[in-house]
Amino acid sequence: MSEFALHGHDLFGEVVKPKASGPVAERFTLPPFTILDARSGEWQERKRAWLSMGFRSEVGRLENSLGMSDAASLGEKDTSIFDPVAVELAVRWFSPVGGQVVDPFAGGSVRGIVAGCLGRQYWGCDLRAEQVAANEVQSEDIAPAVRPVWICGDSMETLADAPAADFVFSCPPYGDLERYSDDPRDLSAMDWHAFVAAYKRIILRAVGKMKPDTFACFVVGDFRDGKG
């Protein structure tokens, strides 16, 4: 697969690469520190470049999914969108080109399309048929040469047939912080004890698909119960 040109090509057909801030950044795209600064100019420049491709990851999700949860009391009314730069870094740093990414909590289209653009195979599972259909449409519109695979179903069951993973990469629900559906199988619709039990079982199944000497990455946000 030819090198992906996030910033396009120059007049001579060469891939445009913004000047790196140093040799470490040149090798790793952005400096691989323990704490990543998503507000930095370099990060924001890459994010704008990715988003200019036309991502609409909220399509297929329930409108105002944050408003269905307790987070509404915080004034957070919009559906969250996954940062494509976070996907790019995780995929580049922790998986080989041509490798298989397995995502048991797929949600929107961003992780699948970015992984595909970077030369990885992608398998993701989501409970909602509407979400899977929307992801497939976006993938065809944004990067028709990329072929992420989205499966509609419960990861508790579908992971048995998932491919062996070079990288398990996902963004699970954060308790009841964001509600995705009223499906009783949806972790975001469960009470805390049921959520934790199902969460552990799905992650155990996902980790069981990993090849030797590979990595797993789960992106989570800050979450506290009503008692803080």
Per-range role (PLM):
Residues 1-228:
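Class I S-adenosyl-L-methionine-dependent methyltransferase catalytic core
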